[in-house]
């Protein structure tokens, strides 16, 4: 990696979606709250930990609203902005929605970072929003100890095409749109063990918009969609399992993985979030003998701007794979299936 004048990753205690509060801790925090009102127009709220809130405004239209922000996962300021914006917009796509506009969320140590650097972060976000065809229509800024950037993303979806994370059916096949290993690569970057070509692969996957989402939403054979982010593949798949009342089988050898991820794992490179994720939900995951260590690391690896996870009928698999390929996702893979059983995951 070329030397940066200021290493953004050294200004924060965590980076990317690895900054998320661990699932078990978050549950304890929320348990102490009274809960929100739930109007009938609120089609999706917090019930199944879905990707975005959805509020119906008429028979054909519902608003999709979401927000994501985090601390730097890379040192290049423009790349940081691009990754954060791509990650935020992804939740709209995951619900089957089309993005409309965004608001910027900016927290920066203005006495530490040059204003030009902060401007480059914001420019990266603008670049991605332009690629998505939406404006950044406003936002909010604060002077903070660590660099923080993200978006509020607003979209629109036809309620009939809305895809939740709780609609999977027994017999469905599971399809993952992007490679895993982003958190592992970020750990390697912090240790100065990520070569330029590996960095480019990491940025390429984390800045690719999940544009298949709205098209997938129109397919009757697609029953559930979510995106894989900070809780790792296992965490987000468990949300699908619990919401749908089903059990998933994941074929470990079929998981698409960034080229150096397994090598880095064997060298002990991983994020702290991986361990926190396992502590939060590991009891819901059964890993076959001989796979325990390395599979656990990959399954819990926090993905920043990860791929769409699709649960669809076997008859729809070919169409879904073709759609991903048409949108430029060459690593899309069938990784498992859903079946009747106690909600959880078996890794074989």
Curated annotation (Swiss-Prot):
Chain positions recorded as ATP binding sites: 20, 48-50, 68, 91, 139-141
Keyword Magnesium: yes
UniProt entry tagged with the keyword Translocase: no
Needed co-factor(s): Mg(2+)
EC number, UniProt record: 2.7.9.3
GO cellular component terms, A-Z: cytoplasm
Binding site for Mg(2+): 51, 91, 227
GO biological process, one term: selenocysteine biosynthetic process
Catalytic activity: hydrogenselenide + ATP + H2O = selenophosphate + AMP + phosphate + 2 H(+)
Site (Important for catalytic activity): 20
UniProt-annotated catalytic positions: 17
Subunit record text: Homodimer.
Protein name: Selenide, water dikinase
Organism field: Dechloromonas aromatica (strain RCB)
Protein encoded by which gene: selD
């Amino acid at each position: 990696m070329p030397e940066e004048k200021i290493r953004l990753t050294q200004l924060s205690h965590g980076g990317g979606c690895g900054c998320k509060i661990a699932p078990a801790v978050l549950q304890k925090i929320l348990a102490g709250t009274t809960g929100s009102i739930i109007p009938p127009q609120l089609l999706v709220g917090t019930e199944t930990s879905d990707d975005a809130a959805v509020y119906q405004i008429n028979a054909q239209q519902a608003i999709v609203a979401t927000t994501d922000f985090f601390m730097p996962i890379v040192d290049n300021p423009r790349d940081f902005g691009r990754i954060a914006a791509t990650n935020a917009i992804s939740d709209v796509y995951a619900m089957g929605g089309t993005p409309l506009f965004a608001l910027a969320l900016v927290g920066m140590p203005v006495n530490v970072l040059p204003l030009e650097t902060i401007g480059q972060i914001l420019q990266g976000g603008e670049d991605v929003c332009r690629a998505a065809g939406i404006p950044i229509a406003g936002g909010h800024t604060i002077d903070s100890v660590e660099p923080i950037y993200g978006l509020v993303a607003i979209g629109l979806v036809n309620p009939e095409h809305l895809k939740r994370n709780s609609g999977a059916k027994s017999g469905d096949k599971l399809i993952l749109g992007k490679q895993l290993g982003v958190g592992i690569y970020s750990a390697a970057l912090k240790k100065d063990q990520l070569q330029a070509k590996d960095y480019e692969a990491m940025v390429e996957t984390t800045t690719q918009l999940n544009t298949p989402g709205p098209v997938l939403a129109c397919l009757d054979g697609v029953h559930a969609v979510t995106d894989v982010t900070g809780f790792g593949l296992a965490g987000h798949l468990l949300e699908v399992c619990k919401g749908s009342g089903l059990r998933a089988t994941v074929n470990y050898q079929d998981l698409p993985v960034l080229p150096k991820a397994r090598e880095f794992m064997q060298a002990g490179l991983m994020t702290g979030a991986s361990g926190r994720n396992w502590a939060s939900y590991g009891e819901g995951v059964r890993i076959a003998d001989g796979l325990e260590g390395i599979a656990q690391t990959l399954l819990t690896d926090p993905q920043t701007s990860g791929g769409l996870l699709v649960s669809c009928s076997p008859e729809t698999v070919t169409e879904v794979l073709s759609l991903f390929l048409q949108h430029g996702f060459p690593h899309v893979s069938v990784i498992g299936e859903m079946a009747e059983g106690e909600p959880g995951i078996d890794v074989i």
